[in-house]
């Protein structure tokens, strides 16, 4: 009787125990990451040949205490290695774990290798060769605290390497994990199975091998036991011959049929080739198709199971498309697969919620380093009787109401960029902005008291509802996650797509970039202020400080300004401002662009202007600025400098985004200036729900000074 250990992915231990017991294993004991079991030689080889769930089968050789590297060396050397494999064979050591003395797995592996080589040298005066690639013998050493376990790896390469999958797509599932997903899905032998996002076909091939009674190890060419001195070649030949007979018979007798599709034709060709190598090609029909074209392959029956590992994104810009994909999949399942079962495996439970289906069972498992979930659904035989899940219903109703009102208003105003929703409901803390045919959803960073997964789920619900309410293709929605504006946050680069969109604002054409920066290049809340500046600037010299992308300069120029001067510290935004001016025919020396620290430039210029627009950051400590700037603290210093540049009958429009900003009216008066708040006049219909989005003032010379 052999004492053996089968390793597996975390979360699959119970399944593996049941599988080993079905093969005839005794005394099965679950530990984290595997199962200890007992069995004779036949069972040992059967477990290697037939286990669909094990990662490796190990034959323990020795356990011993390790308090030093010498203990490790002596414990390994105590094993009679020449009795295990011949000196003419190659070997490799896999070492995992550390303790206070063995702090590096590479060092541990080196000590083990030395002990094995020295064991041969002492007994035979010869040494075996170490081979990193496809060694004849693999020695596995696991160190935990002060205990080392040495085992012979009978598998060789991991058992998930069945031998049929030479080619894979971008994100392949390991075969043993795929087998576990199938076993947990509720799929029954003899019934059909479909995978609408099958990639290189692993789930379908594994299920077809189960249905046709094909041993998962039947196609493997290399094993870790064939160079073992105790290898029973005759018994192994008997077991593989028996497995071949069962596979041929199973292929003829199975009534299961399998259907796979994927949008990538190249991957579908890989899947077909993999199925041929696995010996199950005749059971699987593959098609290159988008999920949107998914149809029930057996509309007249019988019913079966849809099993898939749909894509999930780690990049923010992929999430709208994935949310739309899952939402569409849910609709197709309800409409066309009545009576079927559905089982999806994903690293994103939030995406699975976008199916708008209620799961009846849920399992957890690891896919490499990723925590994953598998959810099983029973699809109603009558689609009208399906139990759906309402997603963000309050948000959807509010957005629908806002859209009905604001779309009509925007058309009357002659604008195509406006805010549809701005954290109207506390549970859905996002802003939704329309830019022509596109929509930007910005999530404000949730408070630390809100559970991160709950916040992410709400965001996914918002995107799902937004796509539905606006009837929007997913590639027309841009998602951003941001904190409320602070200092120079708008200058942070998020991506490098370089995709610009030309939009209309009254009579101006303006370039926006919806993906690359935290902001888009157009502050929507200042729309009326820009319109006012255009009317104020006819025949005037106009100065735009902290100009960003120069949109105010465009309106001033179109309003008939004699000259525009646009000052900003960022070369990127000045180039953008130039692009905006050019789009409106505002070129020539009268339209200047100056790259400078605005505060320093103010202190060093004596130029005079009739209209000055300044929208400074609330706070700034840019590397290019020698001192910090706080708009509440420093606005009088700013006004003193601006007064020098302002002609007698000139006007300063001063705006900022600081909540609770208090203009020092006494200080303004002492400077010989007058300030009038015009915040209410600059707030448009789409920002009526957020009166604190900005504050705005007109500042002029006092009557005494004039």
From Swiss-Prot:
Protein name: Ribosomal RNA large subunit methyltransferase K/L
Function: Specifically methylates the guanine in position 2445 (m2G2445) and the guanine in position 2069 (m7G2069) of 23S rRNA.
InterPro entries in the record: 23SrRNA_methyltr_KL, DNA_methylase_N6_adenine_CS, RlmKL-like_Mtase, RlmKL-like_Mtase_CS, RlmL_1st, SAM-dep_methyl-trfase, SAM-dependent_MTases_sf, THUMP_dom
EC number: 2.1.1.173, 2.1.1.264
Chief site of localization: cytoplasm
Organism encoding this protein: Yersinia enterocolitica serotype O:8 / biotype 1B (strain NCTC 13174 / 8081)
Top-level taxon of the source organism: Bacteria
Recorded GO CC terms: cytoplasm
Family: Belongs to the methyltransferase superfamily. RlmKL family.
Alphabetical UniProt keywords: Cytoplasm, Methyltransferase, RNA-binding, rRNA processing, S-adenosyl-L-methionine, Transferase
Domain THUMP per the UniProt entry, residue ranges: 43-154
MF terms (GO), sorted A to Z: 23S rRNA (guanine(2445)-N(2))-methyltransferase activity; RNA binding; rRNA (guanine-N7-)-methyltransferase activity
Subcellular location: Cytoplasm
The gene coding this protein: rlmL
UniProt-listed CDD domains: AdoMet_MTases, THUMP_AdoMetMT
Catalytic EC class: transferase
SUPFAM superfamilies: S-adenosyl-L-methionine-dependent methyltransferases
Catalytic activity reported: guanosine(2445) in 23S rRNA + S-adenosyl-L-methionine = N(2)-methylguanosine(2445) in 23S rRNA + S-adenosyl-L-homocysteine + H(+); guanosine(2069) in 23S rRNA + S-adenosyl-L-methionine = N(2)-methylguanosine(2069) in 23S rRNA + S-adenosyl-L-homocysteine + H(+)
């Amino acid at each position: 009787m052999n004492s053996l250990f089968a390793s597996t992915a975390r979360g699959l231990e119970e399944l593996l125990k049941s599988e080993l017991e079905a093969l005839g294993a005794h005394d099965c004991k679950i530990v984290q990451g595997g199962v200890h079991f007992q069995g004779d030689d036949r069972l040992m080889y059967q477990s290697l040949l037939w286990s669909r769930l094990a990662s490796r089968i190990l034959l323990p050789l020795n356990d011993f205490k390790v308090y030093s590297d010498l203990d490790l060396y002596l414990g390994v050397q105590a094993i009679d290695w020449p009795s295990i494999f011949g000196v003419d064979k190659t070997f490799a050591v896999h070492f995992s774990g550390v303790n206070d003395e063995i702090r590096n797995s590479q060092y541990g592996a080196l000590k083990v290798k030395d002990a094995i080589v020295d064991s041969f040298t002492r007994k035979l005066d010869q040494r075996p060769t170490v081979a990193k690639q496809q060694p004849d013998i693999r020695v596995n050493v696991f160190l935990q605290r002060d205990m080392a376990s040495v085992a012979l790896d009978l598998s060789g390469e991991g058992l998930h390497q069945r031998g049929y999958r030479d080619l894979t797509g971008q994100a392949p599932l390991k075969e043993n994990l795929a087998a576990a997903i199938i076993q947990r899905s509720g799929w029954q032998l003899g019934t059909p199975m479909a995978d609408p996002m099958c990639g290189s076909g692993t789930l379908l091939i594994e299920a077809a091998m189960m249905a046709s009674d094909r041993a998962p190890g039947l196609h493997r060419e290399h094993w870790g036991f064939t160079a073992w001195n105790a290898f029973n070649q005759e018994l192994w030949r008997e077991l593989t011959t028996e497995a071949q007979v069962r596979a041929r018979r199973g292929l003829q007798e199975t009534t299961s049929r399998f259907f796979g599709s994927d949008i990538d034709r190249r991957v579908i060709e890989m899947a077909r080739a993999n199925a041929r190598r696995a010996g199950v090609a005749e059971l699987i029909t593959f098609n290159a198709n988008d999920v949107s074209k998914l149809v029930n392959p057996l509309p007249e029956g019988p019913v079966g199971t849809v099993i898939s590992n749909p894509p999930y994104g780690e990049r923010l810009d992929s999430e709208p498309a994935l949310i739309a994909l899952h939402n569409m999949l849910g609709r197709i399942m309800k409409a066309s697969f009545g009576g079927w079962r559905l089982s999806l495996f994903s690293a994103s439970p939030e995406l699975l919620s976008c199916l708008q289906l209620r799961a009846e069972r849920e399992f957890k498992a690891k896919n490499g380093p990723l925590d994953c979930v598998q959810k099983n659904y029973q699809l109603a035989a009558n689609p009208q009787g399906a139990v759906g899940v309402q997603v963000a219903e309050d948000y959807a109703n509010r957005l629908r109401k806002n859209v009905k009102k604001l779309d009509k208003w925007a058309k009357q105003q002659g604008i195509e960029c406006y805010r549809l929703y701005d954290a109207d409901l506390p549970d859905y803390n996002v802003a939704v902005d329309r830019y022509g045919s596109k929509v930007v959803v910005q999530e404000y960073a949730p408070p630390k008291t809100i559970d991160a997964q709950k916040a992410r789920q709400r965001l996914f619900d918002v995107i799902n509802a937004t796509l539905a309410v606006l009837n929007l293709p997913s590639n027309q929605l841009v998602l951003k996650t941001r904190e409320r504006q602070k200092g120079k946050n708008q200058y942070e680069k998020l991506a490098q797509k370089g995709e610009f969109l030309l939009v209309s604002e009254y009579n101006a054409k303006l370039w926006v970039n919806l993906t690359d920066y935290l902001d888009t290049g157009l502050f929507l809340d200042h729309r009326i202020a820009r319109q006012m500046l255009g009317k104020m600037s006819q025949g005037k010299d106009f100065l735009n400080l902290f100009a960003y992308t120069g949109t105010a300069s465009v309106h001033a120029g179109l309003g008939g300004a004699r000259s525009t001067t646009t000052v900003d510290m960022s070369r990127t935004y000045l180039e953008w401002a130039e692009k905006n001016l050019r789009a409106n025919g505002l070129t020539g020396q009268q339209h200047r662009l100056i790259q400078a620290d605005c505060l320093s430039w103010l202190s060093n210029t004596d130029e005079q202007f009739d209209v000055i627009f300044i929208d400074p950051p609330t706070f700034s400590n840019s590397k290019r600025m020698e001192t910090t700037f706080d708009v509440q603290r420093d606005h009088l210093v700013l006004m003193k400098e601006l007064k020098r540049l302002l002609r007698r009958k000139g006007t300063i429009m001063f705006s900022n985004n600081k909540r609770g900003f208090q203009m020092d009216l006494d200080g303004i008066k002492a400077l010989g200036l007058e300030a009038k708040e015009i915040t209410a006049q600059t707030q448009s219909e789409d920002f009526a729900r957020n009166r604190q989005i900005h504050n705005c003032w007109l500042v002029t010379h006092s009557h005494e000074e004039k």
